[in-house]
UniProtKB/Swiss-Prot annotation:
Function comment: Involved in unsaturated fatty acids biosynthesis. Catalyzes the dehydration of short chain beta-hydroxyacyl-ACPs and long chain saturated and unsaturated beta-hydroxyacyl-ACPs.
Enzyme class: lyase
UniProt protein name: 3-hydroxyacyl-[acyl-carrier-protein] dehydratase FabZ
TM stretches of this protein: none
Organism: Cereibacter sphaeroides (strain KD131 / KCTC 12085) (Rhodobacter sphaeroides)
Amino acid sequence: MTEAAEATFSADIQLIQRIIPHRYPFLLVDRVRDIVPNKSAVGIKCVTMNEPQFTGHFPGLPIFPGVQIIEAMAQTSAVLVGVSMDLADKGAKVYFMGIDGAKFRRKVVPGDVLEMTVTVKRGGGKVWKFEGRASVDGELAAEAEFSAMLDLPKG
């Protein structure tokens, strides 16, 4: 007997903006797919030359900053928490708390489609722990473990 397939969800940019407060120029996830509540999700970031960070990082050699790859993984995780706990339009915030073992494996440049796969290591309450891997065309670009805190509005 095979296990029943887990229900998966996706979040377009409208739902993402109903869950997380980030906006231009710091909204770093365009879509989240393959969301399995309380387990995992895949965020998508289409990297373009029009991004403001390329003005200074680096002139003539645009490279997407590694810290923003980590932030994109964190935003993907926040959307996963929001979908898992039905937080759209409820004023909840998911705050990035810490990061461990961040490693950068390849450059990310304009034209790349960055896929951030995040997996819950511990969650369901106020503090969540994740494992994240970002890749381009199946090639690992960055990885890290990180934690976040859920802040629900009072009242």
